[in-house]
């Protein structure tokens, strides 16, 4: 997942590649001599230049690496557009992030459902009762959904109430009861908001970048999601 290498080696057949993707070594390329006879090996017209790794168009911004198979695609900045780029730069502004862990899920459904889920502001206050009970995301939050000019990407922005406290009972704003009326935390300070200069207001920004990337900033935590379809034609 990370590290520093001077070359890339396929563990299966030990083909080695330079960091620019060019093939630089093939074991037994000339075959193996046995009993005066050469067995195996690559054909005489084998040219390493024709067997390099697939080259990608790469862009790096704020320490985040993006890659595309389409070398004619517009720049990353133009692809995001100024509206979404503003929230991306707010999140990835060069400060050091600490990776706390990884989570992988296999979902039997259309890959677009994950993108739609992040854009939907109605379900958090109805489905996620923990959010409702402790005022993390409720219908009375100040929220808005912003999109790029081509409606490919979106940022759902939400700000908790005054001083980060929810007012009124959960059922007052959700029209549903919390999962457990007496639910409480042993240490309420777990939910305290510790403002950081880069926030500039929102306590949660959920970004979707079409077609397969999601960035979620919720209070002081950040999570990224990468959708990887595995169906026919993926």
Predicted regions and their residues:
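Rieske [2Fe-2S] iron-sulfur-binding domain
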Residues: 1-71, 78, 82-85
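C-terminal catalytic domain of Rieske-type non-heme iron oxygenases
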Residues: 56-234
